[in-house]
From Swiss-Prot:
GO terms of molecular function: fluoride channel activity; metal ion binding
TM region(s), chain numbering: 6-26, 36-56, 68-88, 99-119
Protein name: Fluoride-specific ion channel FluC
Annotated family: Belongs to the fluoride channel Fluc/FEX (TC 1.A.43) family.
Major localization class: membrane
GO-annotated biological processes: cellular detoxification of fluoride
InterPro entries per UniProt: FluC
Recorded name of the encoding gene: fluC
PANTHER family found in the cross-reference section: FLUORIDE EXPORT PROTEIN 1-RELATED
Cross-referenced Pfam families: CRCB
Topology class, membrane: Multi-pass membrane protein
Length: 126
């Protein structure tokens, strides 16, 4: 682990977490049963991980710290699997099973689709 890698992950994580927090502040109260801020963070993260994987695969000469900054740091700070899990459990514990499953489908299906779209974007434009 290099010192620059450590800094890259930390800076990226802070930026990603701040963006996730901003999404939550702006959109979670709109629909507490399916918080849109968490969904937006996970869907954007799904798309951007596809873009990042495609980009870094085609730009292997870039220093590894750039990938650490973008993928491990920023996208790790942005995406919110633990928050997503607690929100789904809140639906289930409240007896809102259909909303809980909608929540799961929206996050997982949407993120997988957008990851594929991100890869496609880089390959098409690349």
């Amino acid at each position: 682990m290099s010192g620059m890698g450590f800094v890259a992950v930390g800076v990226g994580a802070a930026l990603g977490a701040w963006l996730r927090w901003a999404f939550a502040v702006l959109w979670n109260a709109i629909n507490p049963a399916l918080p849109y801020g968490t969904l937006a963070a996970n869907l954007l993260g799904g798309y951007l991980i596809g873009v990042a994987v495609g980009f870094f695969d085609t730009h292997a000469s870039l220093p590894p710290e750039w990938r650490l900054l973008a993928v491990t740091g920023f996208l790790g700070g942005l995406t919110t699997f633990s928050t997503f899990s607690s929100e789904v459990m809140a639906n289930i514990l409240a007896g809102d099973y259909a909303i809980g499953m909608l929540h799961v489908a929206a996050h997982l299906g949407g993120s997988l689709f957008l990851t594929m779209l991100g890869l496609w974007t880089v390959r098409t434009l690349g």
